[in-house]
Amino acid sequence: MPDSAQPLSERLDALEIRIAYQDETIETLNATITAQWQQIDALTRQIKAFHDRLQQAESNAPAAPANERPPHY
């Protein structure tokens, strides 16, 4: 190989290695983000279920004593 091609070949190898590491990092980040979105979706469903249960409990509860007049009036 001519001397002028050697540095180019080394630079190309370095770039290929760098791209391989970047691809691995991107795949890892993608998997992490996917897992986080799944967890966010699960937590959102859980919060909605708690909210629905709270609304149902509030609608079935008697009127709050703060809204009623005291008996001595």
Curated annotation (Swiss-Prot):
Q: Give the residue ranges for region: Disordered.
A: 54-73
Composition bias (Low complexity) maps to 57-67
Q: Which Gene3D superfamilies match?
A: 1.20.5.300
Name the domain of life this protein comes from.
Answer: Bacteria
Family as reported in the entry's similarity comment: Belongs to the SlyX family.
* Record's protein name: Protein SlyX homolog
Per the UniProt record, the source organism is Rhodopseudomonas palustris (strain BisA53)
